[in-house]
């Protein structure tokens, strides 16, 4: 019993993970309505994060792309990757740093819903980091 507890404790200390559920910002600027109409904004749908250092508003900007779906028709918006929006600026600096220095484990849609004609999308991100990367992350 003690060894199991100790193993779990050391696993968390030596190999911690950082996890968030974040809103996707700027969805009204992109093809999210068409993607939603095709039923692709489902929980668990895989997304890709791409840093955009040349962004004029935020040099740490991170784009969120919905991956292409192999089962989609050739001319649907799901056939090729679609830009959903961005990581919020409040988190973009740290997420951009983690994309360079840590292993992204999970990037998927947590939820998507409409409220008052506005689409809200949330993504779940999980990074596996070494203990020293976690320390560097928290002191940034």
Locations of the language-model features?
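Conserved active-site motif detector
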Residues: 1-140
């Amino acid at each position: 019993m003690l060894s199991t507890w100790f193993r779990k404790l050391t696993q968390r200390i030596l190999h911690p993970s950082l996890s968030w559920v974040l809103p996707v910002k700027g969805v009204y600027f992109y093809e999210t309505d068409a993607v939603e109409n095709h039923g692709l904004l489902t929980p668990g749908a895989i997304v890709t994060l791409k840093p955009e250092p040349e962004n004029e508003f935020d040099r740490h900007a991170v784009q969120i792309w919905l991956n292409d779906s192999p089962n989609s028709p050739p001319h649907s918006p799901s056939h090729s990757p679609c830009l959903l929006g961005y990581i919020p600026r409040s988190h973009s600096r740290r997420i951009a740093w983690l994309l360079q220095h840590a292993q992204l484990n999970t990037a998927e849609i947590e939820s998507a819903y409409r409220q008052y004609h506005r689409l809200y999308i949330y993504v779940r991100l999980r990074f596996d980091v070494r203990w020293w990367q976690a320390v560097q992350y928290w002191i940034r």
